[in-house]
């Protein structure tokens, strides 16, 4: 959603930019679930997180670098983000659903207001014998479409190399 916003806005507003996340690749989670379903793991609760921990702000910086766009990241204060979310929710209610608030909800703000990382000492991928996939391997596979030239960006870059030779 944030990558799509960069197509039409010079500013990327975020809330709680200091909150930390540990993004995980869905295929790694699916592999862990498959092993659990097959009875190949010890019973219990596992917290699954990727190999890197980054702040929400830093994740936005990584995304902007990957899509090759420069935007001002504006970290809104919590009160402003809550007011925005409430206003959007009221607009959805007042229009009887004609306007759907897919921009910012109070639930999203609650999730953003605290760290979402694996707890210290929690069982995770290591206990399952799975090495989680780094973000750098996955981000290009789905963010390329948000680059200025989309799927043709690689062609443009190779042509630029030919012209410079």
Role assignments for model-derived ranges:
Residues 33-37, 63, 142:
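Hydrophobic "lid"/C-terminal helical patch
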Residues 7, 38, 68, 140-144:
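Residues at helix-coil transition
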Residues 4-24, 28, 32-49:
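A conserved pocket-lining segment of Rossmann-fold NAD(P)-dependent short-chain dehydrogenase/reductase
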Residues 36-50, 69-74, 101, 149:
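Core catalytic loop region at the nicotinamide-binding pocket of NAD(P)H-dependent oxidoreductases
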Residues 20-27, 46-66, 75-86, 131-133:
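Substrate-binding strand-loop-helix patch
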Residues 1-12, 57, 65, 70-71, ...:
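Acceptor/aglycone-binding surface of glycosyltransferases and processive sugar-polymer synthases
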Residues 2-3, 60, 113, 139:
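Conserved protein kinase catalytic domain
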Residues 79-165:
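A hydrophobic C-terminal alpha-helical subdomain
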